């Protein structure tokens, strides 16, 4: 009888997971055709075209010289390039990319449900998962040529394997945690800081076996090592990207808003024009931006501290002065604002004795405070929305436990 009931329960959960995936995918497919991009643009076009036509990952060129790319993290460029090798027509190529992103997004919904089950009842977990599935920004992002959907997927996968590895640090879990960590580092440079934070948290609070921690670190290095080796061979520099200077300057110059400002003044343009046009170009240009950004902050710390706090507010809640023409559509700003408010309440109500929940809170705080040093674009919110939904679910759990059963 017990085995029969257990099997029935497992079957129901399997059907639920299949439903969540198919439902999420069906919701996203129309968005591809209604809101989806129709071509590669800007940096993605340059990177993919140079990979396709010249066999080099390069963002800019001077005549026949293609500058090795250090400005953009490589993973999403190679993701786009992967589909390019099938020689689809441009229209089909874009649709295949967007459809693949919709599949990843739908898988992230399934994994998100499993993560929620670690903290909440089944009903609350389903409710929170449906919110994540139907969140307008989450659906809209699938139709954009942007790394944000891949980032959201990998972050959810990272949390899943983080918790499963803490629970059972076998080689399978360790491998997938390391793989996900490495891919996130190759996708977003700032994830190096989050990875270090996660390792320290595992070591100090979760008391994981030292051997397992060392293996996680080593395997993560193995994942990123091909690109590290490429950079060392090209410019004798151990780095993934060199864009911290540009990002700091863009978010901290006299014309900067929450979204940053990339307008060059004459002095800065002259400095950039003097940079030698060689394989170190990206690195040296970034140094120019870094010096300029630090100088701006040093000369007017009060102004940029205020802007920093404004960016934090905009990241968690909404930007009250966005330049994006669609930002204030009710289907965008109302859910973002609401989930921002409820997530803060949820953090306040959270169980401070839960090492798992405390890790998510710490990760959230680190994400917001680090990214806000630079600039905040509307799509960046998708990286923290899974956490905000989990924190918001705490309110439902609190109501259930203190007022009535859900």
Regions found by a protein language model. Name each.
Residues 95, 107-134, 152-153, 172, ...:
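Transmembrane-helix signature of polytopic, membrane-embedded enzymes
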């Amino acid at each position: 009888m017990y085995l029969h009931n257990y099997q029935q329960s497992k079957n129901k959960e399997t059907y639920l997971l299949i439903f969540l995936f198919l439902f999420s995918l069906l919701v996203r497919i129309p968005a591809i055709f209604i809101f989806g991009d129709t071509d590669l643009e800007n940096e993605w076009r340059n990177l993919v075209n140079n990979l396709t036509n010249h066999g080099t990952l390069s963002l800019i060129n001077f005549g026949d010289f293609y500058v090795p790319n250090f400005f953009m993290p490589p993973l999403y460029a190679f993701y786009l390039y992967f589909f390019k090798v099938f020689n689809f027509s441009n229209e089909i190529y874009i649709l295949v990319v967007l459809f693949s992103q919709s599949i990843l997004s739908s898988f992230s919904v399934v994994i998100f449900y499993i993560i929620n089950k670690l903290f909440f009842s089944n009903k609350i977990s389903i409710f929170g998962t449906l919110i994540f599935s139907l969140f307008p920004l989450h659906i809209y992002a699938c139709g954009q040529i942007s790394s944000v959907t891949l980032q959201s997927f990998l972050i959810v996968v990272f949390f899943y394997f983080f918790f499963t590895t803490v629970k059972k640090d076998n080689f399978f879990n360790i491998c997938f945690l390391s793989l996900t960590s490495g891919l996130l580092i190759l996708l977003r440079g700032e994830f190096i800081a989050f990875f270090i934070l996660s390792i320290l948290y595992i070591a100090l609070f979760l008391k994981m076996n030292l051997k397992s921690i060392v293996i996680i670190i080593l395997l993560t290095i193995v994942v990123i090592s091909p690109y590290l080796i490429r950079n060392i061979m090209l410019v004798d520099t151990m780095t993934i990207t060199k864009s911290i200077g540009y990002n700091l300057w863009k978010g901290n110059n006299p014309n900067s808003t929450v979204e940053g400002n990339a307008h060059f003044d004459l002095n800065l343009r002259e400095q950039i024009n003097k940079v030698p046009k060689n394989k170190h170009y990206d690195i040296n240009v970034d140094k120019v931006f870094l010096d300029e950004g630090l100088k701006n902050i040093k000369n007017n710390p009060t102004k940029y501290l205020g802007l920093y706090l404004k960016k934090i507010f905009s990241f968690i809640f909404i930007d009250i002065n966005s330049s994006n023409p669609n930002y204030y559509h009710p289907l965008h700003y109302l859910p973002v604002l609401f989930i921002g408010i409820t997530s803060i309440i949820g953090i306040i109500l959270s169980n401070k004795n839960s090492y798992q929940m405390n890790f998510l809170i710490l990760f959230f705080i680190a994400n917001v405070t680090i990214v806000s040093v630079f600039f905040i674009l509307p799509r960046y919110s998708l990286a923290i929305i899974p956490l905000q939904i989990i924190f918001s679910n705490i309110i439902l759990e609190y109501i259930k436990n203190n007022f009535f059963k859900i």
